[in-house]
């Protein structure tokens, strides 16, 4: 089996965040991964289109985690916007 590309690895890591129960922790982790994803692009490990795809997935996940957190009736304790 061929080794996964950096894009596939990063996408898998983002997908893994969907399993987290704590939406606020998932948001923090998502924000922490942003610079890592950018570094993959700057180091030419992912293509421009792959970077755009990862950013789009990240933005969608951010909205999902915010909605999850707000659905609990508890305030967000971080500046996410």
Region locations from a protein language model:
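N-terminal acidic leader/helix
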Residues: 2-28
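Short, charged, intrinsically disordered terminal tails
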Residues: 73-79
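Short, charge-rich amphipathic interface segments used for partner binding and complex assembly
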Residues: 29-73
């Amino acid at each position: 089996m061929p080794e996964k590309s950096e894009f596939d690895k990063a996408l898998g890591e983002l997908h893994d965040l969907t399993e987290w129960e704590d939406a606020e922790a998932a948001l923090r982790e998502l924000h922490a991964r942003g610079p890592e994803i950018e570094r993959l692009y700057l180091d030419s490990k992912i293509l421009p289109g792959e970077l755009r795809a990862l950013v789009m997935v990240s933005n969608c996940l951010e909205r999902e985690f915010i909605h999850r957190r707000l659905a609990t009736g508890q305030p967000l304790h971080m500046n996410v916007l």
